[in-house]
Amino acid sequence: MATRTQARGAVIELLYAFESGNEEIKKIAPSMLEEKKIKNNQLAFALSLFNGVLEKINEIDALIEPHLKDWDFKRLGSMEKAILRLGAYEIGFTPTQNPIIINECIELGKLYAEPNTPKFLNAILDSLSKKLAQKPLT
């Protein structure tokens, strides 16, 4: 059975495909997840994350942007966007504890992105989680 980390990794891959212009990914996501041995509760978890990010993508991007400092969101790589969007969605819209989310995103960054990406992800998601702790989403 897949772990939540593996489910999140698969969601990152789906979000990456979506960001790269693959609109069909929304329709085939369940079968792609099952091919990766993500089933039952983890399948439901992964689909809820994927669909949640897509449903709130504009709101998520607006949450991330102020924390980028000298970066332009449009210039970020597709993988970085995918990981940030997943992390921001979980921080803002799920009950999972923020340190767990941030750690998972850092680990996914180590697997899927450039060597400096985990530090970047940590800084952005930590800043976002602190802001939302002061002023939660309504």
Curated annotation (Swiss-Prot):
Top-level taxon of the source organism: Bacteria
GO cellular component: cytosol
Biological process, per Gene Ontology: DNA-templated transcription termination; transcription antitermination
Listed InterPro entries: NusB-like_sf, NusB_fam, NusB_RsmB_TIM44
Keyword field: RNA-binding, Transcription, Transcription antitermination, Transcription regulation
PANTHER family: ANTITERMINATION NUSB DOMAIN-CONTAINING PROTEIN, N UTILIZATION SUBSTANCE PROTEIN B-RELATED
HAMAP family from the UniProt entry: NusB
Function: Involved in transcription antitermination. Required for transcription of ribosomal RNA (rRNA) genes. Binds specifically to the boxA antiterminator sequence of the ribosomal RNA (rrn) operons.
Protein name stated in the entry: Transcription antitermination protein NusB
